[in-house]
Amino acid sequence: MIKIYKHTGGPPHRMTLPTPEPNRLPYWLRRLWPIYCFLAALVTFGYALYDPYQIDGDAVSYMDIGDLIRAHNWHGIINGYWNPLYPAALSLGHTIFHSTRYNELHAYYMVNFGIFLLEMLAIVAFTDALVQLRELREDSKSLLPPFLLDRYTLRYLGVDILLISTQRELSMGKVRPDALLQAFLLLGLAALLKHLATSHLRYAALMGIALGLAYLTKSFAFLFTFLCIIALVVFRVAWQRYAVPRAVAAGLLALICFAIVAGPYIAALSKQKGRFDFGDSGNLNYAWFVSGTEKMHLQPDQTSSFGAAEVHLTHPNKILLKSPVVVSYKQLPYGTDPDWFDASFWNDRIKAHMDPRLQVPVTIACLVRILRYIANHPEAWLLLAVLFLIGARLRLDWRPGANAFWLTPILLGAGVFCIYSMVNVEDRYIAFGFLAVLLPAFAALRHSGKVPVSAQNAASAVVLLLALLAVGESARIVGELRRNLKVAQSPAGWYDPDTYGAARALNALGVGPGDTVACIGDRACLDTHYWARLAGVRILTEIYKPAETPVYSALADMPNRDQVIDTVRSQGGKVLVGYFTPGVMTGTNPVSAGWRELDSSPFYALPLNLPAAPSRDNSRP
């Protein structure tokens, strides 16, 4: 029997299935991106205001070169150990903020903040280039699952890792070029990936320019540039099946642009040294850390201290006294501390030789430091573990013709680790390598194929959460730094009461700009000699002592202490400055007699050639 139902009018009723709500997360990732960048910049600006004093001998050398740039003393700027671009940035900041010696650190912290903004731009350029190459290399007929992280998610991740690095090894208080180097290396790598994605020669040229600027920041980029050019040619030929002449032409264009930017400085340095020279820092550090060559005050007759290096010194330190070693630095007319202003001057003609017996233990120690760095940056690895738990899979197809977009940046990042593991590894050296390996690895993550599309939303949400937590943690740290300043009643984060107090006390004694002084001990002479720059004086004589021996003990154990003091006095320095353990300089014994405490700090000064009355003209900065 067939039942017929009467239609009562209107359209017939249709069965409707529930439709999924539109995916709003990508929309909010795009909308929140400018706000997140603003928050990241804001908390980093807080670091620039409140980060504590972290000045060392390297920082003073960069500041001194910046002074020479402002004075247009081009001969003094050419330096085989420190490159000029970061000092030029410091000089620009000094000029913009109209700084004096006593407040210049504020300007330099602001320069570091500007470099952080450049790093953010470089991160965006790098991640966007990664995604562009990834999408263009993906075969539309590929049966592989889609990629897990989109362009904006990778941006958040990159800035998040940068912000964490700024909390640690690349902090605002470190007046060093590593952050600027990282920015230019990232821009160079981004240009390389853009060229691989588009075949446009302008990106090869931009790569050469960015790497040239990286070289002017730090000579490490000289070797890295050639690795990038080789990677460009090999990837174009082997993976993209381009003709060899076209790939080589792009590499030559990058090399020409690099030479245009870096060539004049290399030519000037080579002329100064009398040989082709792009920088001596790598060679000297290899000699010091691997070959076992003596680092400080090496003399031509100290053959037992040459280690495995070949040594033919052209202008070693002038030794005034052998026991203890008293050294004069009058040969070099530049720098607050000429000994560290240009280490390549005093150690010219040291040629390091590779020795596997010496290399192996050094490399093992460097690998341990790399593992320690990875352990000290667990956030990214924990994120990777969470993404694997929600279904992410890492499929790295490296075969020619495959979508191996990740291969070039990961190999170049690994190259950074390999280069530094041959000599010496510090966290700030390998931060770029960490980014160059990690971000492409995250970009290569795909869905497992068995997980719904919602897994991508979960992955993006986890990355966003980590990025916001990094901003929140930075805000907490900045707030704590600000509270500490109020408790200590310090005028600024960059202010160190001992260092600034010692400099003002020296000025009050009549020691000021244009004067020379002597020092004793590694703390006063090398590690914390910013007091001399603040006071406006140059350290031209040093009583050298081993780092492990306290200064007071070294003075007490000198059988010829009076002869040593007379030798130092004969060099014309106004005072002898040392950094002493608090409480030992009582003034009641022959060792401490005559020494003057400098403004309740651990710094003390022994008058040598002071005028009868302090000069008021030199008492102010």
Describe each PLM feature range.
Residues 51-65, 76-93, 99-106, 273-280, ...:
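Extracytoplasmic catalytic/substrate-binding loops of multi-pass membrane glycan-assembly enzymes
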Residues 148-149, 188-204, 214, 236-240, ...:
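Membrane-interface transmembrane helices that cradle and orient dolichyl/undecaprenyl
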